[in-house]
Amino acid sequence: MNFNLIDINHWSRKPYFEHYLNNVKCTYSMTANIEITDLLYEIKLKNIKFYPTLIYMIATVVNNHKEFRICFDHKGSLGYWDSMNPSYTIFHKENETFSSIWTEYNKSFLRFYSDYLDDIKNYGNIMKFTPKSNEPDNTFSVSSIPWVSFTGFNLNVYNEGTYLIPIFTAGKYFKQENKIFIPISIQVHHAICDGYHASRFINEMQELAFSFQEWLENK
């Protein structure tokens, strides 16, 4: 997958990037509830699992916007991937650990869903941190905490402050006033994403949840 270098000196975001990367190293998270009432009803009728559906939605928004695909490569050069693949957690009740498995993103939901099922079949019961080898560099993290409907979530990433890729976490969905919601948290680096960009992610997730008929059976 192609990694496109960013010319920082001619980048409109340069002063913001340098400020939040070097002067005030800053990451932040935003949590919001996404209504999934009709979506959940529809996928249950079709016997479709919810978790890969949610992962697909997140990956679709990520791949629709360059700011969610910006990072440093292994040489330390800044750039962005043409596309990114989700790496998601699978819980093992037997020993209370989890695995991180990646599936290649596909714009077709049905193809992505099929690939997800194959990966779960092949690797889901292997109790290793990363049971599927050869994870590409162009992945982003998705995790699920389906035991609690949290109202806020924050990860403390201890490094040099150079991890720029967003991290996504979903909680337990819940019912409120005859509607069903799920809390979604996005954690981003302020050098790359402002409140506008994080808000756009939340809003587009909601749009996908409402417009599921346009993509749920997309081949």
Curated annotation (Swiss-Prot):
SMART domains: CAT
Alphabetical list of PROSITE patterns matching this protein: CAT
GO molecular function, one term: chloramphenicol O-acetyltransferase activity
GO biological process assignments: response to antibiotic
The entry's keywords: Acyltransferase, Antibiotic resistance, Transferase
Cited SUPFAM superfamilies: CoA-dependent acyltransferases
Subunit structure: Homotrimer.
UniProt xrefs under PANTHER family: CHLORAMPHENICOL ACETYLTRANSFERASE, SLR0299 PROTEIN
UniProt-recorded name of the protein: Chloramphenicol acetyltransferase
Organism per entry: Clostridium butyricum
Gene symbol of the encoding locus: catB
